[in-house]
């Protein structure tokens, strides 16, 4: 029964990673192709491209962690520290770049008359200032990983105190990761609430002048809101499943709850890439065109005798 569950979970994990990889590679190719053609690389496109690259790395790190922990446990304990460090770095930048992208989407809305937003629109051309907290908050996570790995090495030597510390620090690193995600998550929630306020203000203005609730500005608000809500749900689910998985990690790598949490948690990096693809009009059009061309080629091959 356990081997059957592992097989089903592995197939589901592989399918999600392949689909997520396809979306991220497509985003990078479309952005680079447009950059070469137009000789112009907008800030939002640059951030989206870097996010897709980090998302690609994260997906394959997740696959490496899965295959080594489930099928090669001995190998897993040898490469665990390297996988953990790379996973934390890639996931950290994934979270922050997605957060910065949501800020850019917010600042695209021209409905704000607040001086803070007018100032931000002028300074957002320098994203390095926004990325500064990202680099600062990365170091505590890496320090906690090093402490956790040292404690785990002592715990495997049969020291009861070390084993107790192993459980403590494994749980502590999960909490450190959660706290490290608190800043971008809070920023994201502020953007989300401000966008709702902006939409309500816009709808009131439209109704006041008898223009109804339809219009390009309202459509832009709703589209950005849909992207942000999707990210909010997926990221919240990812954090919750990560905490549950880490608390069960100290019991067994093959605990059903641990396997299920990992498989469902992969929805965040794989599905969110498609949401970003759908939310970008230019990339969405290229994706639809590519799918139509692929379908036409298959149809022509089937028609040939």
From Swiss-Prot:
The keyword Disulfide bond does not apply. Residues 1-9, 68-69, 121-127, 198-223 are extracellular. One of its GO terms (biological process) is detection of chemical stimulus involved in sensory perception of bitter taste. Its main location: membrane. InterPro entries: TAS2R. Keywords: G-protein coupled receptor, Membrane, Receptor, Sensory transduction, Taste, Transducer, Transmembrane, Transmembrane helix. CDD domains: 7tm_TAS2R43-like. Residues 31-46, 91-99, 149-176, 245-305 are cytoplasmic. Pfam families: TAS2R. It comes from the Eukaryota. Belongs to the G-protein coupled receptor T2R family. Several bitter taste receptors are expressed in a single taste receptor cell. Putative taste receptor which may play a role in the perception of bitterness. This is Taste receptor type 2 member 136. The lineage of its organism: Eukaryota, Metazoa, Chordata, Craniata, Vertebrata. The gene is Tas2r136.
């Amino acid at each position: 029964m356990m081997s059957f569950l592992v097989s089903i979970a592995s197939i589901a994990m592989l399918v999600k990673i392949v689909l997520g990889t396809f979306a991220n590679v497509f985003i990078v190719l479309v952005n680079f192709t447009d950059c070469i053609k137009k000789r112009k690389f907008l800030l939002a496109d640059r951030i989206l491209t870097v996010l897709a690259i980090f998302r690609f790395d994260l997906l394959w790190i997740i696959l490496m962690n899965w295959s080594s922990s489930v099928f090669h446990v001995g190998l897993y304990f040898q490469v665990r520290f390297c996988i953990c460090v790379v996973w934390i770095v890639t996931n950290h930048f994934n979270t922050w770049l997605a957060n910065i992208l949501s800020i850019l989407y917010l600042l695209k809305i021209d409905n704000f008359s607040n001086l803070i937003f007018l100032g931000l629109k002028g300074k957002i051309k320098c994203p390095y200032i926004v990325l500064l907290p990202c680099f600062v908050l990365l170091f505590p996570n890496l320090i906690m990983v090093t402490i956790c790995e040292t404690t785990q090495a002592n715990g495997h030597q049969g020291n009861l105190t070390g084993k107790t510390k192993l459980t403590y620090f494994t749980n502590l690193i999960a909490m450190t990761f959660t706290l490290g995600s608190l800043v971008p998550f809070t920023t994201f929630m502020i953007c989300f609430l401000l966008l709702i306020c902006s939409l309500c203000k816009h709808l009131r203005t439209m109704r006041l002048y008898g223009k109804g609730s339809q219009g390009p500005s309202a459509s832009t608000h709703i589209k950005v809101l849909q992207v942000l809500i999707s990210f909010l749900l997926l990221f919240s689910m990812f954090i919750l499943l990560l905490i549950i998985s880490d608390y069960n990690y100290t019991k067994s790598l093959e605990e059903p709850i641990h396997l299920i949490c990992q498989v469902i948690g992969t929805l965040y990096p794989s599905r969110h890439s498609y949401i970003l693809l759908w939310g970008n009009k230019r990339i969405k059009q290229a994706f639809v065109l590519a799918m139509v061309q692929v379908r036409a080629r298959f149809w022509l091959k089937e028609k040939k005798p």
